A protein has these predicted regions:
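Amphipathic beta-strand/beta-sheet edge segments enriched in Tyr/Trp
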Residues: 1-21
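Short, solvent-exposed loop/turn segments at conserved positions within beta-propeller repeat blades
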Residues: 46-49, 90-93, 133-138, 177-182, ...
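Residue-level detector of Asp-centered blade-edge/turn motifs that repeat once per structural unit
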Residues: 31, 35-36, 79-81, 123-124, ...
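Multi-bladed beta-propeller domains
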Residues: 57-73, 100-115, 143-161, 187-203, ...
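An edge-strand/N-cap motif at the start of beta-rich repeat modules
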Residues: 33-56, 63
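Residue position within the beta-strands of beta-propeller blades
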Residues: 41-44, 84-88, 127-131, 171-175, ...
């Protein structure tokens, strides 16, 4: 077996190594690891009111700043090909933009008097779930990008955030404080009622989905350092089984890989921050230390 790998950009050498690993892995008929070649996109704070949007490889060896100047937060890939992404520019009137990573072309999508975040993209990439607070409280909205049509999905008087598609985009899960503490709920897109989805933990404040699987963040008891632990758990809409994915530290911002076989997340343990990857089908996990800067949010 032989193949030549080359690039005109020295900074992209890590992707050559990833390509070599993927090809060798496929040649040996081992489980596919195509996720190695995908970009990670994240928002990193520079100061209290300034953050950049950066793309990187999963080891963070390659990094390139795409958006800078002002407070740029909550990047979310707009397509599986990773050519475009959504992000929020938090200025006097928070605005959601769609940007091409290669051309830099930007398109204004929506703006709001309060918070606005694109949290998930439909499988056909035509619709997005948006957390928005046009008045006081946040609710979940469905926005058709092609038709420019906005539909409000939740109307609770408290906090509804972090909407994600499940079950072939027919339902959504979201985080709400409607029972007091934050927890994960589900509802059909075309129906009003919502049901509690997670019966484990007292403070479940974030979630990500793939198909009928949900990974959520649960705040738990304090660890040896005196800090609260935030652990990741996986559940399915089809069973009652709960799978623990982490057991120590502060584990947050989980995101499924495009094939659903891996999850990326941020881990804080003591004074060390790392980007973590869990291979769900193989009980393998990896940590890649963050050298500097606090990450605001991440997508894969």
């Amino acid at each position: 077996y032989s193949k030549t790998y080359s690039t005109s950009q020295k900074a992209r050498y890590p992707f050559l190594v990833h390509s070599l690993s993927i090809d060798l892995n496929n040649h040996l008929n081992a489980p596919r690891i195509d996720w190695m070649q995908r970009f990670v996109i994240f928002s990193q704070y520079r100061s209290a009111k300034e953050s950049d949007i950066i793309i990187a490889d999963y080891t963070l060896s390659y990094q390139k700043t795409i958006i800078k100047g002002g407070l740029n937060i909550f990047p979310k890939w707009a397509d599986k090909s990773q050519q475009n992404f959504y992000y929020t520019k938090a200025n006097s009137k928070p605005t959601l933009y769609k940007t091409n990573i290669y051309t830099g072309k930007q398109k204004k999508i929506l703006s709001s008097n309060g918070m606005i975040v694109a949290s998930d993209v439909s499988d056909d990439e035509d619709e997005i779930l948006v957390t928005m607070a046009p008045t006081d409280q946040t609710d979940i909205y469905l926005y058709n990008v092609k038709r420019k049509k906005l539909k409000q999905l939740t109307t609770y008087g408290g906090i509804d955030v972090n909407g994600n598609f499940i079950d072939n985009d027919k339902r959504i899960v979201f985080v709400s404080d409607r029972l007091g503490a934050p927890n994960v709920f589900a509802k059909a897109i075309n129906k009003k009622g919502a049901e509690i989805l997670v019966h484990h933990g007292r403070n479940n404040n974030s979630a990500t989905t793939f198909g009928n699987y949900i990974i959520y963040v649960s705040r738990e008891k304090k660890d040896d350092t005196g800090s609260n632990t935030f652990n990741l758990y996986m559940v399915s809409t089809k069973t009652d089984y709960i799978r623990a994915l982490t057991s120590s530290g502060r584990n947050q911002f989980p995101k499924f890989s495009v094939d659903g076989e891996s999850v990326i997340y941020l881990k804080q343990y003591g004074n060390q921050s790392s980007l973590g990857i869990i291979r769900l089908n193989y009980n393998e996990s990896y940590l890649f230390p963050l050298s500097k800067g606090k990450i605001q949010s991440i997508d894969w």
